Design a protein with these regions (language model features):
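Short, Lys/Arg-enriched, disordered terminal segments
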Residues: 1, 240-241
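Conserved SAM-binding loop
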Residues: 2-89, 124, 166-170
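S-adenosyl-L-methionine-dependent methyltransferase catalytic module, highlighting the catalytic core
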Residues: 59-62, 66, 72, 76-210
Length: 241
């Protein structure tokens, strides 16, 4: 089974949809922090596109732990969130402070609690959490759907890339009891995630290098590869004229 989490009105072909709001008419009505309707290891792919930032911390950790629970070993998880690192750079150097701050806090949601942003992530933060939950083979993913994971938002007359899209494969169960970790995070939400994990496990996250720059290098490689393919096709079209 494949599930598109936090579906709103989007219904991708081949996916069941899940949303907290019955008004969105999803296949499954549920809170992504608690999905008892879905059996352990019953899913082959999950997409959570611009969902996690709408949860408070550490509820977002609890949601990712639930995703790990329902995914089978070898299953694929695709997450997209606003890229805090890029947004902070926009505040510092690109002259778009109101736009960037609005993206961070989810301006436009108004009084709709579920559409407001309550937390944010960098690639490093997501990689730490996903590694603990048993994921690896991290990569970038692209979405053709009409939603935030396609990577672009309009800022005036320009398209701005602000979406952090991470794909990961579940390799094993979490390193220890995720409910215990959730309670520890809840009791001290400002504590560094890696320190809490180091206290409860054999410091696997702290010992292993998880490279955020490597992830971005893969993005750049794919961009260069795509540009080369476009140039190749353009040359063929010129020759055919």
């Amino acid at each position: 089974m494949k599930i598109y989490l936090g579906s709103r009105n989007i219904k991708p072909e081949g996916f069941k949809t899940l949303d907290i709001s019955p008004a969105c008419n999803p296949d499954i009505v549920a809170d992504i922090t608690q999905m008892p309707q879905i059996q352990d290891g019953s899913c082959s792919e999950l997409i959570a596109s611009h969902v996690l930032e709408h949860l408070c911390w550490p509820d977002s950790f609890k949601a990712m732990a639930e995703m790990a629970r329902i995914l089978k070993v070898g299953g694929v998880l695709k997450i997209a969130v606003p890229d805090l690192r890029i947004l902070l750079e926009m505040i510092k150097s690109q002259g778009l402070p109101f736009y960037a701050v609005g993206m961070i806090f989810g301006q436009g949601a108004g009084s709709d609690f579920h559409n407001q942003h309550h937390y944010g992530f960098t690639a490093e933060m997501l990689l730490q959490i996903l590694k603990f939950l048993g994921f690896s083979d991290f990569d970038w993913w692209n979405s053709a759907l009409p939603e935030g994971a396609n990577g672009w938002y309009w800022a005036g007359q320009e398209k701005i890339a602000v979406s952090l899209n991470i794909k990961a494969v579940k390799k094993r169960p979490p390193s220890c009891d995720t409910e215990k970790i959730f309670e520890l995070l809840k009791s001290n939400p400002l504590q560094e995630f890696s320190r809490i994990i180091a206290m409860e496990t054999s410091s696997e996250i702290a010992d292993e290098q998880i490279s955020e720059p490597l992830l971005y290098q893969r993005i750049h490689f794919k961009l260069i590869d795509a540009m080369q393919r476009i140039a190749y096709l353009e040359n063929i079209l010129k020759e055919q004229k």
